[in-house]
Structures are given as structure tokens and as C-alpha cells.
Swiss-Prot record:
It comes from the Bacteria. Gene3D superfamilies: P-loop containing nucleotide triphosphate hydrolases (3.40.50.300). InterPro entries: P-loop_NTPase, Thymidylate_kin-like_dom, Thymidylate_kin_CS, Thymidylate_kinase. The keyword Kinase applies. CDD domains: TMPK. This is Thymidylate kinase. Keywords: ATP-binding, Kinase, Nucleotide biosynthesis, Nucleotide-binding, Transferase. Pfam families: Thymidylate_kin. Belongs to the thymidylate kinase family. Its EC number is 2.7.4.9. It is an enzyme of class 2 (transferase).
Length: 210
């Protein structure tokens, strides 16, 4: 039986790492033990090199379109070399970010042309998409404060507050229009967030159970 692809999305400081643990815990309860974890950008040797270029300052400025193209290069390497093979083997994949991140950060935050974004997505990914996306919603002020508490911020995390407000607004619009996405209030206590995530996964499981 083919596996399923679950993605966790959200701004910096939303708690994606904890959410991943919650999802895996629920899957184990449901009898799904063979779970693969991925992150974007990254997840393959080439994709990890691209991740470093995307997240760190380089000798020359990285243009917005160059950033987006590197993200898609890393994404398709991960999809074709890791995610699709795992799904075909019946494994489940839990991803830290996927295409919705690019639509929100580069489409919303960077304000890149929507037509260009859509064309690139369709050209690179075709109809491939997650079976379930869990979006952790958080006010950028709260999220960035949490991120700063973890230590030094990367190149994208250093963007101004308006960038993250635009990114969040795009996330909210994307989730509203996506029947395969659920939104979780990530400003709650970690216990309530975990409970909401577990409930969302179980409800999705029941509605898709054959």
C-alpha cells in the first residue's frame, strides 16, 4: 500500500519540531511505524548544499528569484530521490516544510509574481502534493521572539517584520483555499498545541480510512 505525505508548515518559532514529534506519536498509535522525516530545503546531499546557500550570507547578494530557484532545485531532488521512493515502498513521510513555504515566503514575503510562482510549481512538481498539511499559525512578533531565543538567526529569519506579516497573510490565504490543510493555533501552550495536532491527524485519518 502506498504511504502518505504529511507536511508541517509555519513561521519561525511556530514549533515545527515539537509538531513533528506529535505527528509521529499519533502515527505510531495508529499502527504506522515506518515513518521517514524530511526537511526543506535539504534532505539529500545536493539539497543540503543548496540549503546552506539559501540560509547563509554569501559573497554576492542572492536575488529573490535565485533564492526561489534554489528552493525548487532542492525540493525536486528531495521529492524524486527520497519522498516518492519512500511512499512507493509504503512508508509514511513527515516533512518539515514543502511547497506551501515557497508560496508563502517567496510569493507573499518576497512578493514575487504569482503567475511565475504557479508556472514554476506546476513545471517542477506537476500534481504532486501532500496528503495533509498542518499549518502552525503564530503572530510573527511572538514567533521571531521564540526564534531569537534559540540563538543566531539565518539570512531569511533576519528579514523585517513586514516580510513575515506578508508571509503569514499568504499562509492564511493558502490554508483557507486548501481542503487538505488544517490550521493550528501555535500561540497556545505546547500541551494544547500537541493535543490539537493529534486530534487533527486522527480526524484526517478517520475521514480517509478505507
Amino acid at each position: 500500500m502506498k504511504g502518505k505525505f504529511i507536511v508541517i508548515e509555519g513561521l519561525e518559532g511556530a514549533g515545527k519540531s515539537s509538531a513533528h514529534q506529535s505527528v509521529v506519536r499519533v502515527l505510531h498509535e495508529l499502527g504506522i511505524k515506518d515513518v521517514v522525516f524530511t526537511r526543506e530545503p535539504g534532505g539529500t546531499p545536493l539539497a543540503e548544499k543548496l540549503r546552506h546557500l539559501i540560509k547563509h550570507e554569501t559573497e554576492e547578494p542572492v536575488t529573490d528569484k535565485a533564492e526561489l530557484l534554489m528552493l525548487y532545485a532542492a525540493r525536486i531532488q528531495l521529492v524524486e530521490n527520497v519522498i516518492k521512493p519512500a511512499l512507493m515502498q509504503g512508508k509514511w513521510v513527515v516533512g518539515d516544510r514543502h511547497d506551501m513555504s515557497s508560496q508563502a515566503y517567496q510569493g507573499g514575503g518576497r512578493q514575487l509574481d504569482p503567475h511565475f510562482m504557479l508556472t514554476l510549481k506546476e513545471t517542477v512538481l506537476g500534481d504532486f502534493e501532500p496528503d495533509l498539511t498542518i499549518y502552525l499559525d503564530i503572530d510573527p512578533i511572538v514567533g521571531l521572539a521564540r526564534a531569537r531565543g534559540r540563538g543566531e538567526l539565518d539570512r531569511i529569519e533576519q528579514m523585517d517584520l513586514d516580510f513575515f506579516r506578508r508571509t503569514r497573510a499568504r499562509y492564511l490565504a493558502l490554508v483557507k483555499d486548501n481542503p487538505k490543510a488544517v490550521m493550528i493555533n501555535a500561540e497556545q501552550s505546547i500541551e494544547l498545541v500537541q493535543a490539537d495536532i493529534e486530534r487533527a491527524v486522527k480526524n484526517w485519518w478517520k475521514s480517509n480510512e478505507k
